[in-house]
């Protein structure tokens, strides 16, 4: 099943592929137009026109984008690793920001994975677990079953095994039974627990001991142990036991049933798990993690649907889900047997109303994931067992448990939780959303700056004026004023407000209407003031015009890096020292080029007067002033 499960491409991969195609078509079209205008209208030499067109293409293409995406994702993985989330695939970081459904295991992820035996029902009486009396026959048989139907080991140094089995061994030890290990070694045969039978059986000293789900176990019993005697198991007894089971389950407790019988054969088969003598029930509690309720609230606030998937009894599952806020009034709970009866279409129709899946097997998980994906959801699925691997691989974000998870599940997952904690997933989602926002803001910065250069070249081509930028200018702009501020924007920490946003769709484009309008608005404003400096310089000569246009565009784009950090005005967001550093480096290099005579010939820069340098500074500052005023007004009304 694992080999047959195909891993889907991440939303970031889809978005960037679509963005690249659209951008390439646009740039090629513009370069062809510029080449045509220069050759046939401006009467430029073909080689010169070709150099301008190629340089324009180089300037228009955001070469820094690939490195920005990689750097941002890499830094985010380091941050998430410190927060107990190890990312195996870089693209999975951003995919977390798209997650709209989280399918989580209950035990250990939403709960503390610290089982404690609480109640015992035997001899038709409910008693506290610490009131067992090993001198009573029923209690003695029950305590033996606790140890024999058990593969855990406990010592002063550590406990190894399933938390439920560890809790049963600890209860056994509370009664000064120091021979638990010796008793376990006297087991002769075992039928291990599996999710289909929901039973485990062992043989020891001519007896068969069985533990399992009470509703399943009762169907295998025809007698009941009362005061040391085996009596007929009546329907009234079964009803009383199931009522007690449901009452304990409603309190969020896990309930196990125990039975035994005499057994003299040398081979143990599944058909031997019949005609049993019912001994009693034990309830165990695994409290919800303290942080689970808040994490669930954060999920709902973020527009994410949290879902609990467990093998526990439906009543137990719903009780825990209610305590932490997953199961609300009007929600439904679906059992594995009910799931089997639904067609794929029926399941898809049920999905929005179901918040708890109980008594499910690992193969049910993959159906749930596929059904949600068919509805267009981005699904995160947790798992720890070998059989969970196909569902982890099928999901958009497979989340394996670092403590209790199998190596197979870790291999199939995109992310590993080193603390097995649901709240860690929510933290990772916040980071993922911030990553996408930073990448998008970096792209807006690159495109708006590139657009301003393209429009300047187009305007001068149509007006049959000298080109405002030489190829060396465009290359400097692309390497310095593009890369450093864009990388700094990608390092933005983000705000807590990002949690209040709804998850974006997997098909949402980077170049949507809103982004195109923003890029166009900002690019045109930068272009207007660049051309203003160009025309002022043109009064002197072409080289001065080109120098002033180059200086204005470089400085305007360096300042624009601060605008693209957020949709909020600068005074509402904390300082990003990476952006400050990028600006200082960029301005230092630009000043060196504009002032130092040694670089004038290399970059084709003329000697500029103080007045011309002041015009460059003012022209470069105005676009950012206008954009900041717009952000102030829009943030006040929004």
Predicted ranges, named:
Residues 539-540:
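Short, hydrophobic transmembrane alpha-helix segments
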Residues 505-524, 543-544:
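Membrane-water interface at loop-to-transmembrane-helix junctions
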Residues 30, 529, 556-559, 589:
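Membrane-embedded alpha-helical transmembrane segments of multi-pass integral membrane proteins
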Residues 481, 526-527, 546-561:
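Generic alpha-helical transmembrane segments
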Residues 1-500, 510-511, 524, 535, ...:
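Conserved cytosolic headpiece of P-type ATPases
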């Amino acid at each position: 099943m694992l080999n047959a499960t195909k891993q889907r491409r991440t939303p970031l991969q889809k978005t960037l592929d679509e963005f690249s195609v659209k951008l390439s078509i646009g740039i090629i079209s513009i370069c062809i137009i510029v080449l045509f205008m220069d050759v046939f209208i401006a009467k430029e030499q073909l080689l010169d026109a070709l150099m301008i067109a190629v340089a324009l293409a180089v300037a228009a293409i955001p070469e820094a984008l690939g490195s920005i995406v990689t750097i941002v994702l890499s830094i985010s993985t380091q941050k998430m690793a410190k927060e107990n989330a190890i990312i195996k695939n870089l693209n999975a970081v951003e995919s977390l920001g798209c997650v709209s459904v989280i399918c989580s295991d209950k035990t250990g992820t939403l709960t503390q994975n610290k089982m404690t035996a609480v109640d015992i029902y035997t001899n038709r009486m409910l008693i506290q677990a610490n009131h067992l009396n090993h001198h009573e026959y029923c209690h003695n048989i029950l305590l033996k079953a606790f140890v024999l139907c058990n593969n855990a080991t406990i010592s002063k140094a550590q406990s190894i095994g399933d938390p439920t089995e560890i809790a049963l061994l600890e209860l056994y030890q509370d009664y000064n039974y120091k021979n638990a290990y010796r008793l376990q070694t006297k087991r002769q045969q075992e039928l291990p627990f599996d999710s289909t039978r929901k039973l485990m059986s062992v043989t020891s000293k001519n007896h068969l001991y069985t533990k399992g789900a009470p509703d399943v176990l009762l169907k295998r019993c025809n007698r009941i142990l009362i005061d040391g005697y085996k009596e007929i198991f009546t329907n009234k007894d079964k009803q009383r036991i199931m009522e007690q089971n449901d009452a304990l389950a409603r309190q969020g407790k896990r309930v196990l049933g125990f039975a035994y019988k005499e057994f003299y054969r040398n081979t143990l088969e599944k058909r031997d798990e019949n005609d049993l003598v019912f001994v009693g029930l034990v309830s165990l509690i695994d409290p919800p993690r303290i942080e689970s309720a808040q994490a669930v609230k954060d999920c709902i606030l973020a527009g994410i649907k949290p879902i609990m998937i467990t093998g526990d009894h439906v009543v137990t599952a719903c009780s825990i889900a209610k305590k932490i806020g997953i199961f609300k009034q009007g929600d439904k709970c679906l059992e594995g047997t009910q799931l089997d009866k639904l067609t794929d279409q029926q399941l898809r129709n049920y999905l929005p109303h179901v918040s708890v899946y109980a008594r499910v097997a690992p193969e049910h998980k993959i159906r749930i994931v596929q059904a949600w994906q068919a509805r267009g959801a981005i699904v995160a699925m947790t798992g720890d067992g070998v059989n969970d691997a196909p569902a982890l691989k099928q999901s958009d974000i497979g989340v394996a448990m670092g403590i209790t998870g199998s190596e197979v599940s870790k291999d199939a997952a995109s992310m590993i939780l080193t603390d097995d904690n649901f709240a860690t997933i929510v933290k990772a989602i916040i980071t993922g959303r911030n990553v996408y926002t930073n990448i998008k803001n970096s792209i807006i910065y690159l495109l708006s700056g590139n657009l301003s250069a393209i429009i300047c070249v187009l305007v001068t081509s149509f007006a049959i004026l000298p080109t405002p930028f030489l190829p060396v200018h465009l290359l400097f702009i692309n390497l310095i004023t593009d890369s450093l501020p864009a990388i700094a924007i990608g390092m933005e920490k983000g705000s807590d407000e990002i949690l209040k946003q709804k998850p974006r769709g997997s098909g949402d484009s980077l170049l949507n209407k809103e982004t195109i309008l923003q890029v166009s608005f900002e690019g045109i404003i930068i272009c207007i003031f660049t051309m203003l400096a160009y025309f002022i310089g043109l009064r002197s000569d072409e080289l001065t015009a080109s120098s002033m246009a180059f200086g204005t565009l470089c400085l305007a784009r360096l300042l624009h890096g601060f605008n693209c950090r957020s949709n909020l005005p600068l005074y509402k967001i904390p300082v990003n020292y990476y952006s400050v550093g990028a600006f200082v480096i960029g301005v230092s290099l630009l000043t060196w080029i504009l002032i130092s005579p040694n670089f004038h010939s290399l970059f084709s820069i003329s000697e500029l007067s103080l007045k011309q340098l002041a015009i460059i500074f003012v022209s470069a500052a105005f676009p950012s002033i206008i954009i900041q005023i717009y952000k102030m007004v829009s943030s006040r009304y929004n």
